[in-house]
Amino acid sequence: AGNTGVGVHVATESGGIQIRGNSIGTDVTGLVALGNLQGVLLEHKNSVGTSDPAFANLISGNIENGIVIRGAAASESGVYGNDIGLDALGLPTLGNGGAGISIEQGASKCQIGWDSGLDNRIADNGGGGVVVSGSDSIENLISHNSMEGNTGPGINLLGAPLDDPNDAGDPDEGPNRLQNTPVLLSAERPIDLPSELHVVYAVDTDPLNAHYPLVIEFFRADADGTEGAVYLGSDW
């Protein structure tokens, strides 16, 4: 911690490395920021975190981004089970100054979370929760993560401070092919099934730019209603 450059830098041609069990950007207590310029920089295929909570990383308090996955050589990297922007008590008090995670410059097919135990908690960061930028950064999976209190959108496919708006037919290219978000058409609780909530939604997308079947995830929103704080379930 406290480096003027990157806390952990995995350079090109350094493969098979798993970064786990670290406090990156905080003091040893995990309660006080002692930020690096960037927390973690991956420039080759590697993984940050694990499904074992005992070896989770705390990546918080860094001046810029918490984790950066950069370049085509870093494609297929994974980020699992980390606390990014939280303190050691799990409170959102030590956000990184930029994005929680930035995927950029052609990094593709990366996996950010997935299923129980592999999800990341990403909160209180000065940018988006996960930002994907660069027109050739595609097919990155962002799944099951808890995001709240970030300054930018939970998932940002433009690298800009605003959400990527939906467009008709979704034929465009860009980060993750600028995938449209689902549109909620209705939600109702049937009188005869009061414990159930029936939801109707639509996703306007180009079959050439998406993998079918689409997996749609549902979350309980954070306090300002713009990010998914608690994963509820999936439909496909």
Model-identified regions with their sequence ranges:
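Glycine-rich beta-solenoid repeat tracts in large extracellular/virion proteins
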Residues: 6-13, 26, 30-45, 50-55, ...
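Solvent-exposed serine/threonine-rich low-complexity stretches and specific carbohydrate-binding patches
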Residues: 229-236
